[in-house]
Amino acid sequence: MDGSPEVTAFILAGGKSTRMGSDKAFVEFDGRTLLARVLDLARSVTQDVRIVGSAEKFASFAPVVEDIFRDCGPLGGIHAALRSSLSELNVMLAVDTPFVSWTLLQYLISQARATPDAIIVVPASEDRRQPLCAIYRREFADVAENALRAGNNRIDRLFDLVKTRTITEAELNVAGFSSGIFRNMNTPEELKTEEGRV
């Protein structure tokens, strides 16, 4: 061991929050900001927690990683996160998914440990992979960088380029997780509707 943590968690907080009308990270949900919720969640699985976003906005909350490829969406954030990481396993979490649980993260990490040849371990829900609640090994940074340099910002196009362990919705259900766990908050109306369900 070289002293680096086995797991680092990254909060992806660089979105524009256009539909929300204000920065999602600081929107309150059941009495706490979405950022505070996801920081606590991330810290429940590792002490090494970082925010991918603006240092000006987030430096007082946790160490911040800023995008190397600007305005390239989540793939740019994941790339920057992995370039900054010394960990083999890297948890990526969107700031606006308050229903993701500690038990789900532990499950994903255990699946990543059980499939050491998988570069990505990603759950699927309603026939869609959930790349913003997934585990990435550091080497995915090279794949992401090649795509970003070529102008391809779509992460879903990259899953087939590397060994990817997709956890099916059926597997998640057997493990006790519902598809609703990945719901994200995009509008004030969604926040209001979902409050009280955490």
Show which residues each predicted segment covers.
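Nucleotide and nucleotide-moiety/phosphate-recognizing core
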Residues: 2-155, 160-180, 192-197
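Dinucleotide-binding Rossmann-like beta1-alpha1 core, especially the glycine-rich loop
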Residues: 183
